[in-house]
Swiss-Prot record:
Taxon lineage: Bacteria, Thermotogati, Deinococcota, Deinococci, Deinococcales
Role summary: NDH-1 shuttles electrons from NADH, via FMN and iron-sulfur (Fe-S) centers, to quinones in the respiratory chain. The immediate electron acceptor for the enzyme in this species is believed to be ubiquinone. Couples the redox reaction to proton translocation (for every two electrons transferred, four hydrogen ions are translocated across the cytoplasmic membrane), and thus conserves the redox energy in a proton gradient.
Protein name: NADH-quinone oxidoreductase subunit I
Keyword vocabulary terms for this entry: 4Fe-4S, Cell membrane, Iron, Iron-sulfur, Membrane, Metal-binding, NAD, Quinone, Repeat, Translocase, Ubiquinone
Cofactor: [4Fe-4S] cluster
Name of the gene: nuoI
Amino acid sequence: MGVLDIAKGMGVTLGKLFQKPVTVSYPEERVTLQPRFRGRHVLTRHPDTGLEKCIGCSLCAAVCPAYAIYVEAAENDPLNPTSPGERYAKVYEINMLRCIFCGLCEEACPTGAVVLGNEFEMADYRSRDFVYGKEDMLVGVEGSLPQRREAQRTGKPVRLGFKVPKGPRPELEGVEYPR
């Protein structure tokens, strides 16, 4: 019985040897994300006015099960408005180490300001760098927002096109890390 079992095992191994591999050579090869993929948070603007869509209602913070979102609202200046409403988000922070990417904040947002984009490469050296502020999440009107909503409507997967930085990072020169 022992030789027959070894032959069966070797047959499985040899059969898998000539199949296409499941993994990819990341980061040289990029994967195609599914239409409903939820990545890094993005705050959007109105395409016609360029004003922020976030009105500082804090519904996203209230619905977050991980308590990862902090919103501080302020009154909007009528002469120089930041958002179209009476209020705007003076402070909008999200702790990406606490976020579980559930998408409840995106569903709760009444203006569609919070969108979970396609970016998933969020590596850094310090945990404090994972707390993203409003400036880190706002995207411009020119359409730099990942086309996640369009992919959800059409059902076609989104192809990633991020550039991978190569070479030395001058901002990290001279930094010593504990061993």
